[in-house]
């Protein structure tokens, strides 16, 4: 739903009654989730200079064939790449620091033609989780994401072994 709202330029209220998966968009959801999420995006990019792509499929190509995901938003402001994830569910707040999902997206995006532009020459990578009414932000470096990628490659290869140790979770 956020993709449609952001790319259309229309007011969120124009989407009332629309369905996303099994969720009907109501004024209450706009007030409690969508508007706070858009305000968070404005706080991240107050000058409206960010270039961004929404809902981009990212993957590791030949490094890890078949390993991919879909980012909510990949962007760039100055020397900072941005990886943003919308969390609209109620319940447990998701922490952003060292968040494996966001680091996965950043590492995969760096190897994906359609998203790598946001990381080229970046000296910082900001991870953002927007979980209205909360916004959590963490700035890291391309070097940290490269280390995460190495850890991920080792974990995937270990999991592919015939007698791989199983883990709950």
Where are these regions (language model features)?
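Metal-dependent nuclease catalytic cores that hydrolyze phosphodiester bonds in DNA/RNA
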Residues: 1-76, 80-81
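A cyclin-like helical interaction fold
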Residues: 33-44, 142-149, 169
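Mg2+/Mn2+-dependent nuclease catalytic core
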Residues: 48-166
């Amino acid at each position: 739903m956020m993709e449609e709202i952001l790319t259309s330029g229309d007011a969120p209220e124009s989407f009332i009654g629309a369905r996303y998966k099994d969720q009907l968009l109501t004024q209450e959801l706009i007030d409690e989730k969508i508007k706070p999420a858009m305000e968070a995006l404005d706080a991240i990019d107050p000058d409206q200079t960010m270039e961004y792509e929404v809902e981009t499929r990212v993957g590791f190509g030949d490094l890890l064939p078949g390993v991919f995901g879909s980012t909510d938003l990949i962007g760039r402001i100055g020397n900072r790449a941005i990886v943003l994830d919308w969390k609209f569910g109620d319940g447990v707040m998701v922490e952003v620091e060292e968040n494996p999902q966001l680091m996965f997206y950043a590492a995969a995006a760096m190897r994906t033609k359609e998203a790598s532009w946001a990381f080229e020459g970046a000296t910082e990578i900001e991870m953002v989780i927007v979980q209205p009414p909360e916004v959590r932000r963490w700035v890291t470096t391309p070097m940290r994401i490269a280390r995460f990628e190495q850890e991920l490659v080792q974990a995937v290869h270990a999991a592919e072994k015939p007698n791989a140790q199983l883990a709950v979770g």
